Amino acid sequence: IRDRLNITENIFERNLSKRGDKTAIIWEPNDPKESPIYLSYKELYEQTCTFSNALRSKGIKKGDRVIIYMPMVPEAAIAMLACARVGAVHSVVFAGFSAASLADRINDCEAKMVLTSDGNFRGNKTIPVKDVVDEALEKCSSIESVIVLERTKQNINMEDGRDSWWHECIEDQPKTCDSEVMDSEDLLFILYTSGSTGK
């Protein structure tokens, strides 16, 4: 029997009525100056739906490939859930990989979009994440859009017509979103090996 269901329904529709106010995600920062973030099932659902609508507004649809090249922040989980909600195939790439390794993965899966951040904090250093994406995309032809999470507030290049800020994309988006009906054999994500080429 080939069942049809969106995996996010097992997280949200199944749990919202009974566990809506219960904690779904606890994010602990590395930097003691930052505060932990607690998201309830209801908050996670609303943020996932808001970003799902943003993805659809950018033309992302069932079967499209989306690269997630982000630090370990709550928005990374939201990005994965939003991709699943709209039926897009996500591929998480460690945000410490080089531009060449990122480009290899983008080209291999023929991704249409990259989700990233302006930068990341690692110890006392600020890592220029978006710069790595820009360098990688010089070798990629499939990417149509890039959504950038403002994490470090450092100055970065934003290419007109391609790059958008996360907070601007979700502005005025509804907090509900119909899930894409998926077949049990449909692809959910692509996870490459940790080698330099991922093959």
Regions found by a protein language model. Name each.
Residues 66, 83, 187, 193-196:
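Conserved S/T- and glycine-rich ATP-binding loop of Class I adenylate-forming
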Residues 8, 21, 25-81, 98-103, ...:
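Conserved AMP-binding/adenylate-forming core of the ANL superfamily
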